[in-house]
């Protein structure tokens, strides 16, 4: 949401105020939305590598139980890509940098999401 809002020219205040009345408003948005908007990935609440590890274990447990979690597996892969891009020791919200990197490399916003 933040990536799209910034691309559309919305201010942080307008985006966060608008998000409050939608399903996008969550603990994470309330506590980290402003950090993502400002691209302030330090200080951290938890490292991206730790979030990736937790997602990896979660997907493995689901697979062992015969449960399909394709969205969770996709997130795990995004966190792995962010770690491999060098963001592993930053705040877990730095996964957002994949979108910024793709845009700076001339990719469309959809490409890093596939």
Report residues per predicted region:
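Amphipathic alpha-helical interaction segments
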Residues: 14-17, 73-77, 94-97
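Small-residue-rich helix-loop
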Residues: 10-23
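Short secondary-structure capping/turn micro-motifs that flank functional sites
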Residues: 21-22, 35, 78-79, 98-99
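Helix-loop "lid/cap" segments that line or gate small-molecule binding pockets
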Residues: 4-5, 61-62, 98
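Interdomain hinge/lid region at the active-site interface
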Residues: 8, 27-92
């Amino acid at each position: 949401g933040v990536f799209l809002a910034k691309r559309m020219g919305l201010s942080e205040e307008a985006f966060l105020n608008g998000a409050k009345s939608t399903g996008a408003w969550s603990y994470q948005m309330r506590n980290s939305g402003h950090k993502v908007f400002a691209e302030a990935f330090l200080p951290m609440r938890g490292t991206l590598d730790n979030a990736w590890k937790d997602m990896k274990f979660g997907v493995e447990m689901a697979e062992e139980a015969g449960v399909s979690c394709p969205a969770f597996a996709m997130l795990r892969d995004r966190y792995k890509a962010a770690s491999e891009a060098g963001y592993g020791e930053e705040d877990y919200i730095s996964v957002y940098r994949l979108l910024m990197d793709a845009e700076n490399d001339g990719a469309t916003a959809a490409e890093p999401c596939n």
